[in-house]
């Protein structure tokens, strides 16, 4: 018996040595089993339910040109409308609250807390999902540009304590060309190296915030399985297919089945469809048909299925819920969503 135990110990030591050489085991390595919702999802009980998320405002749209919510009061109203239409989650970005500066992002913890508090006061049931994406540094006007790329987002997570937060899971050249053959904006790099991903994962784990892995391209989808294989992530994993960014994967329904093949079966996934109505709505319908979850809102599109301009995220959610029911499924309640996504 002693020799058997010694043999097992030797094998374990060799394995740990190998993992350390590969820089996988670290002091603060994330273990998603620490989330209180680990293994709480039973596919046999609520597998027909669809998590419907409302993306209320985004980071790029100018409120002077488009009617998007900026202030805590406006965000609370938009969240209430989306909830009443059938959304169980709201995904939010923070905008500069100074007069005339609402077109700029904010990483002020006070802004994040004020917005999330207003939403929770208006609709205590709804799940709040924070953005964490930065291009360059996570700077804030009041910080004097001294923050690093994760400092602002982490400070906002600590202040607002959402149940879910976006985890941008790979880098992307963020590009768009005009019909005239010029750049719509100066080419940008949306940098999300593994080191940054680890930092954000560790922060979310410590705060008991569930990561939602944002995948803008096919290689990022495939990377999630690699993160899992090396121990950086563990199931249950929540994954978002961000479809329609000009330099990412296209918003095409036929892509979804191929992308599903690159996920582990236990992964919970949703489609975020960006663009005009001829691309977004068929893609969202296909996602619902294939068992996925879905997201829409003024961050993702301004257009209803008939091509008319939407007045609010609530109006977009109303149309999305109609599609969910047309394919024979039902939107999940907030309580069901917490079970499905493993936040409870």
Which positions does each model-derived feature cover?
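N-terminal mitochondrial targeting presequence
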Residues: 1-34, 41
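N-terminal small/glycine-rich loop or linker at the start of catalytic domains
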Residues: 42-67, 169-184
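Active-site mouth loops of central-metabolism enzymes
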Residues: 58-74, 134-147, 186-190, 270-276
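Glycine-rich, proline-tolerant flexible connector loops at the mouths of alpha/beta enzymes
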Residues: 89-112, 242-243, 303-305
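Alpha-helix-loop-beta-strand connector modules within alpha/beta enzyme cores
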Residues: 102-130, 200, 259-266, 320-322
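Active-site beta->alpha loop and helix N-cap motifs at the rims of alpha/beta catalytic domains
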Residues: 112-191
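Catalytic alpha/beta core domains of metabolic enzymes, predominantly
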Residues: 164-298
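C-terminal helical cap(s) of enzyme catalytic domains, especially alpha/beta-barrels
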Residues: 306-325
């Amino acid at each position: 018996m002693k020799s058997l135990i010694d043999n097992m110990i030797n094998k374990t030591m060799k394995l740990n040595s190998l993992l350390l050489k590969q820089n996988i085991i670290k002091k603060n390595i994330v273990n998603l089993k620490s989330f209180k919702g680990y293994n709480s999802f039973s596919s046999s009980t609520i597998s027909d339910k669809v998590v419907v998320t409302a993306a209320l405002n985004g980071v790029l749209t100018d409120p002077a040109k488009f009617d998007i919510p900026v202030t805590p009061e406006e965000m609370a109203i938009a969240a209430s409308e989306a909830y009443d239409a059938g959304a169980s989650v709201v995904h939010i970005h923070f905008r500069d609250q100074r007069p005339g500066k609402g077109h700029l992002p904010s990483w002020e913890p006070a802004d994040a807390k004020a917005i999330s508090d207003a939403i929770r006061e208006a609709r205590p049931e709804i799940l709040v999902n924070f953005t964490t994406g930065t291009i360059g540094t996570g700077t804030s006007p009041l910080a004097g540009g001294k923050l690093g790329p994760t400092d602002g987002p982490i400070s906002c997570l600590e202040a607002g304590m959402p149940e879910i937060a976006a985890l941008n899971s790979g880098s992307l050249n963020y590009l768009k060309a005009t019909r005239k053959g010029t750049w719509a904006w100066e080419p940008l790099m949306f940098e999300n190296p593994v080191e940054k991903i680890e930092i954000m994962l560790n922060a979310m784990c410590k705060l008991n915030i569930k990561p939602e892995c944002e995948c803008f391209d096919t290689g990022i989808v495939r990377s999630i399985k690699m993160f899992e294989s090396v121990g950086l992530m563990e199931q249950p994993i929540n994954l978002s297919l961000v479809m329609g960014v000009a330099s990412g994967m296209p918003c095409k329904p036929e892509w979804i089945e191929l992308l599903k093949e690159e996920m582990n079966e236990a992964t919970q996934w949703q489609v975020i469809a960006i663009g005009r109505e001829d691309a977004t709505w068929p893609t969202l319908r296909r996602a619902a048909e294939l068992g996925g979850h879905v997201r829409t809102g003024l961050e993702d599109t301004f257009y209803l299925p008939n091509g008319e301009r939407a007045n609010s995220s609530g109006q977009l959610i109303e149309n999305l819920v109609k599609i969910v029911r047309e394919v024979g499924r039902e939107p999940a309640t907030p309580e069901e969503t917490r079970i499905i996504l493993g936040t409870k």
